């Protein structure tokens, strides 16, 4: 029978459902069993109104979800979940909770997903999460923790991704020659933000001397002032520097990392890439980026670079493309040098 007019949700004729709800004093209980051909779903749960203690156990075995959602691409599902705890105020140090879940089998379209486990806990206002996946689409482990009794974001995240199968996920036309893998760590405290990403010979580091909320507020304020100054056709570099967040980013990459492998599958390659930028009210915006040995089809560019330096009166920019004597196509040097001052700008093009 259709539940919604478009037939996207239905109740199969072969379904049998038994449910029991009870209450004795302050103890509430519920049990449910669903049978649909070979599929079985069992739920057992309880909650105490006085102590706020609860538990819930859910087991699903070979349930054909497609029989309930015929317009979706979800088919067989086998999974388990259990939850146990006391208290419902997540900000209270007295609240405790534990959650365990596992996905043994999920058929979604042409994908078969299995080997996924999640564990979460809450104790003394500290929430923890552990996630693991071991299947042909994704092999990874992740850990995270966060304090819930802070007025700011206070937590950490660690990810170890051994392989993401981009070909089976339909993101690239053919299998990559090397695994798409990386490790990532992030940390937010009362006075700093840190991010690191390592993948082969690709290394990214980011750090800010503030909370995430303050960083977002400073960034929004900077964009707002800059937009207003652009509309008024007059830049005040000193005013812009005063609202800059204190942050820095450094990125280095060779040609042995997931990004280079992904680009290679698209017919793009390079020798190395470097980027380094810093932002502080004291020194303004300063940075440099460069790509060496960029190749796209028959085009080869030896060096592409860009630098920026700001003081209280101007922002100096320089960029260019250089092909050296050993370039198989043509040798040249093209540079752009400019200044963006408070009320005007200048740009010089040089081609040799």
Model-identified regions with their sequence ranges:
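Membrane-proximal interfacial segments on either side of biological membranes
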Residues: 1-352
């Amino acid at each position: 029978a259709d539940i919604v007019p478009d037939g996207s949700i239905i109740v199969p004729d072969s379904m049998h459902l038994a449910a029991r709800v009870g209450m004795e004093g302050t103890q509430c209980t519920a049990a449910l069993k669903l049978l649909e051909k070979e599929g079985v779903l069992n739920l057992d749960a309880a909650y105490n109104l006085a102590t706020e203690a609860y538990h819930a156990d859910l087991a699903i075995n070979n349930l054909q979800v497609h029989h309930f959602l015929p317009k979706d691409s979800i088919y067989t599902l086998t999974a388990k979940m259990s939850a146990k705890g006391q208290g419902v105020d997540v900000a209270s140090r007295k609240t405790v909770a534990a959650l365990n879940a596992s996905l043994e089998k999920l058929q979604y379209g042409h994908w078969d997903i299995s080997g996924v486990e999640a564990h979460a806990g809450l104790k003394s206002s500290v929430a923890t999460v552990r996630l693991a996946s071991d299947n042909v689409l994704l092999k990874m482990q992740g850990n995270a923790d966060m304090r819930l009794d802070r007025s700011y974001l206070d937590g950490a995240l660690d990810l170890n991704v051994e392989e993401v199968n981009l070909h089976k996920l339909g993101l690239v036309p053919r299998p990559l020659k090397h695994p798409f893998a990386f490790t990532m760590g992030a940390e937010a405290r009362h006075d700093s933000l840190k991010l690191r990403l390592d993948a082969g010979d690709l290394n990214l580091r980011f750090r800010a001397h503030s909370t995430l909320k303050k960083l977002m507020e400073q960034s929004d304020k900077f964009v707002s002032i800059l937009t207003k100054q652009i509309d008024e056709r007059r830049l005040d570099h000193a005013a812009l520097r005063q609202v800059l967040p204190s942050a820095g980013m450094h990125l280095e990459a060779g040609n042995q990392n997931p990004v280079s492998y992904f680009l290679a599958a698209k017919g793009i390659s390079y020798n190395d890439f470097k980027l380094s930028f810093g932002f502080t009210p004291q020194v303004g915006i300063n940075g440099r980026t460069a790509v060496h040995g960029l190749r796209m089809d028959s085009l080869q560019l030896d060096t592409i670079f860009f630098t920026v330096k700001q003081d209280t009166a101007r922002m100096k920019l320089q960029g260019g493309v250089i092909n050296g004597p050993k370039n198989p196509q043509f040798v040249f040097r093209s540079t752009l040098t400019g200044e963006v001052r408070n009320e005007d700008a200048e740009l010089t093009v040089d081609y040799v």
